[in-house]
């Protein structure tokens, strides 16, 4: 009988240990860290297709939302936990694609679709692309994949290679391309932006999202 009790006690302790381990791992993945698989070659050579990365959620704070509502493509409310840091230029970020169902007229996050890209500009920066190279006014730091920028700069007729050169905000008067872009000021908290025609084109969707 004592032997049976010992075996039962061992299994009970093991069950409690496994349960606590699962709970701790779940909470760590929810609030602290999570992993993602790189789905394409767009981040090469730094990250290759199939690589896995570990994301630190504590920098800007974990997001909490109803996963089941998101899976059903319903509107959701996102609550962000407090974070303890800020992003830096050239950091690798994981974020949600800002549009759904190929609708480009307004921002509507698809929280189940993740992108992995490099941070080029920060709030308060003014971003430009000149002759294919990324530039931040007042910053001499090399940004992004320099070799890829150099290859794009050396292409005389990128359209022949299936490259779409037109880009945001897709306005004929501004005529921005992936080789000649900006200047695009990145607003920061507390900054006032004058709503002229250009700024309306640049920030209309962001203003609509924040409202």
Protein language model features and the residues they cover:
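Cytochrome P450 fold signature focused on the C-terminal beta-domain
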Residues: 34-35, 121
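Soluble "head" domains of membrane/secretory-pathway proteins
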Residues: 2-10, 44-211
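N-terminal signal-anchor transmembrane helix
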Residues: 36-46
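Hydrophobic membrane-insertion alpha-helices, especially the h-region
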Residues: 13-31
